[in-house]
Amino acid sequence: MRQISMQEAAARLKSGGLLLYPTETFFGIGCRVSDDDAIARVFQVKRRLFAMPLPVILADAGQLPLVAQVAPALAEDVARLERAFWPGPLSLILPARMHISPLLTGGTGTIAVRVSPHPVPCELATLVGEPIVASSANISGHPAVTRAEALDAELVQAVGAVLDTGPEPTGGEPSTLVEPLGNGRLHVRRSGAVHNDRLRAAGFEPESGIA
């Protein structure tokens, strides 16, 4: 398993490569969000269905306009969510910018974004100057892992490089996925590390099961 430095990892992403790297929960596999060929390779090496969207990690909230559009009616709620939960394991589902690959959105026209509390993906996104893809580093259907040594050998060989630095992922629940609906209402698309009681405590009204 070839482990590389942060600078090497950023250069690899800039040149169109894939990377295995730690996040706050599990190891992830990623590339630049603007690299359609690399995004397609993420699906291939994970054996992931193309209809399944890929989440994205931002360096900070300032990168949000690079990938997502926030309607004026949602702007206040999105800003409140950013202040209350970023950095943290809360992904916002928002309309994607027109230039964003449909592979990232799964054809839905929306994209899931978060600012990770783990320093590695945020520094990578800073160094490459754009958000990065952040899918779990596993073959689809296999368990996600928290240690580099536990990464699937086939995946490591296909990707070719591992950045193993910073805090070890803690495992546990994945990020919570929410879609802002306006007026403080949130459609909870996936329950996770940020529970409904925390959303309510921040002044939001979480809802599930919306068609």
Regions found by a protein language model. Give the residues of each.
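Active-site-adjacent structural elements in enzyme catalytic cores
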Residues: 1-211
